[in-house]
Structure formats: C-alpha cells, structure tokens
C-alpha cells in the first residue's frame, strides 16, 4: 500500500487541478504563456497520477475500474466486479 502522504499529495493536486482548470484553459487559448507559468505547478493535470482507490498503488491501474491489477484480479476472482469473468477459450 502506498504511503498516506503520497495519496494525500495526489488528492491535493486533484483539488488544485479542478480549481485552476478554467483559468488554465483560458490562458492557453489566449496564448498567454507567461501568465500560465505563474500558476501553481501542481495545478497542471500532467502532475496527477492515477492511483488505485483501495490501495493507492500508482502503477498497473485499470482506469475503467479505478483499481490496480492486483486488486482487480482479487475482486474479479471473488465475483465482486459485476460483468467481469475469467476468460476461457
């Protein structure tokens, strides 16, 4: 499981991205890169990391489910993910 501080940092970044999204789009459209560079660094969407909602793992995530591969497999085998079945052919 990821450290609590790493998860909290990512949540803080999500809030900043949401707060400055409109202003950032406006500045991009106007081509005002000087003002854009004055915005907080963490308000850029590229600094966000998709993390597992259960464990906070930052790698091997399925966006559709919001889970890392380990938790996805565990929950799928337990039958807790509706519509997901193990493939067999």
UniProtKB/Swiss-Prot annotation:
Query: Which ranges does the record mark as transmembrane?
Result: none
Keyword RNA-binding in annotation: yes
Which keywords describe this protein according to UniProt?
Ribonucleoprotein, Ribosomal protein, RNA-binding, rRNA-binding
Q: Name one GO biological process term.
A: translation
Q: Name one GO molecular function term.
A: structural constituent of ribosome
Pfam families the record matches: Ribosomal_S14 (PF00253)
For this protein, the record's PANTHER family field holds: 30S RIBOSOMAL PROTEIN S14, SMALL RIBOSOMAL SUBUNIT PROTEIN US14M
What is the documented function of this protein?
A: Binds 16S rRNA, required for the assembly of 30S particles and may also be responsible for determining the conformation of the 16S rRNA at the A site.
Give the multimer and partner information. Answer: Part of the 30S ribosomal subunit. Contacts proteins S3 and S10.
What is the designated name of this protein? Small ribosomal subunit protein uS14
Organism equals: Chlorobaculum tepidum (strain ATCC 49652 / DSM 12025 / NBRC 103806 / TLS)
């Amino acid at each position: 499981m990821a450290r609590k501080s790493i998860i909290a940092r990512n949540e803080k970044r999500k809030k900043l991205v949401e707060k400055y999204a409109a202003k950032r789009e406006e500045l991009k459209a106007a081509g005002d890169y000087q003002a854009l560079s004055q915005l907080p660094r963490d308000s850029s969407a590229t600094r966000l990391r998709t993390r597992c909602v259960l464990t906070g793992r930052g790698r091997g995530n399925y966006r559709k489910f919001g889970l890392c591969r380990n938790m996805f497999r565990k929950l799928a085998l337990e039958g807790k993910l509706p519509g997901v079945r193990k493939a067999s052919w």
